[in-house]
UniProtKB/Swiss-Prot annotation:
Primary role: Odorant receptor.
Any one GO BP annotation for this protein: detection of chemical stimulus involved in sensory perception of smell
Name the UniProt record assigns to this protein: Olfactory receptor 6K6
Organism, scientific name: Homo sapiens (Human)
Ranges facing Cytoplasmic side: 75-82, 149-167, 245-264, 320-343
Family: Belongs to the G-protein coupled receptor 1 family.
Positions glycosylated per UniProt: N33
A cellular component term, taken from the record's GO annotations: membrane
UniProt cross-references to Gene3D superfamilies, sorted A to Z: Rhodopsin 7-helix transmembrane proteins
Lipid bilayer topology: Multi-pass membrane protein
Residue ranges annotated as Extracellular topological domain: 1-53, 104-127, 189-224, 286-298
Amino acid sequence: MKQYSVGNQHSNYRSLLFPFLCSQMTQLTASGNQTMVTEFLFSMFPHAHRGGLLFFIPLLLIYGFILTGNLIMFIVIQVGMALHTPLYFFISVLSFLEICYTTTTIPKMLSCLISEQKSISVAGCLLQMYFFHSLGITESCVLTAMAIDRYIAICNPLRYPTIMIPKLCIQLTVGSCFCGFLLVLPEIAWISTLPFCGSNQIHQIFCDFTPVLSLACTDTFLVVIVDAIHAAEIVASFLVIALSYIRIIIVILGMHSAEGHHKAFSTCAAHLAVFLLFFGSVAVMYLRFSATYSVFWDTAIAVTFVILAPFFNPIIYSLKNKDMKEAIGRLFHYQKRAGWAGK
């Protein structure tokens, strides 16, 4: 009976010890696998022979237009003395940000469309996320500064020249960059410390917080917290700009001169269109929380978010802007004359 009880105890020990050792081995294996994740794979891109080239050419043309249009806007404002005002200073900053903003994602998209290697290193992914969101937040801050500029110009025109001096414009721009590049830094630093396990496939066309965090060995509530932080940032900027424009519209409607109505509305219409375009695409992209879409619509929303505002901003600011059209015409006329003189 004693021998039987001892054997039974050994059997009990083994039944308790074996699962414990298995769990420890599983954790060690998982830990080893986590350290092996050195790159992420983009799973949303088609192969080159399955339609990748079909998407490559339109995206390349769109990227070329974004670079050319925003670069022309930036150069025209810098060289045109008549455009050296706070309004056009912020437009030139916005154009420069659009160039940098699209360059963080579109070149990698183009590479993935024609290459069989659709991967990005972990460090490269973190850098892409950092610059993409930093530039996006900076752009929203610049749009806020532009709304404040229009608010002062229309609601307090007599004090406008003494308030919106070049020094203040530079300070607002530097402050926008400071906020943009500082706010995202803690999140990127936190993500860089997370262990990644299991699949390394990112179900998106660029590195973004939610797709990357879904691959980490962490609780999903962290993803919800990050989403809530981003939503608060977006809503705060939106409210500041929206309230400014509501006040502007009230003041414009109170003007007695029809000419004053037309001039004020034409001045603010372009900025209001850019504001709605930017925050509309941001809202569709980030204020959906747990809502899910099909692969097609998810990709379409991401592409639209990346290219929509940068593509239309040069068109909006130059289409009905007399000063901008005249400045662009003078620039090209000067280039044409310089070319003839060179010949």
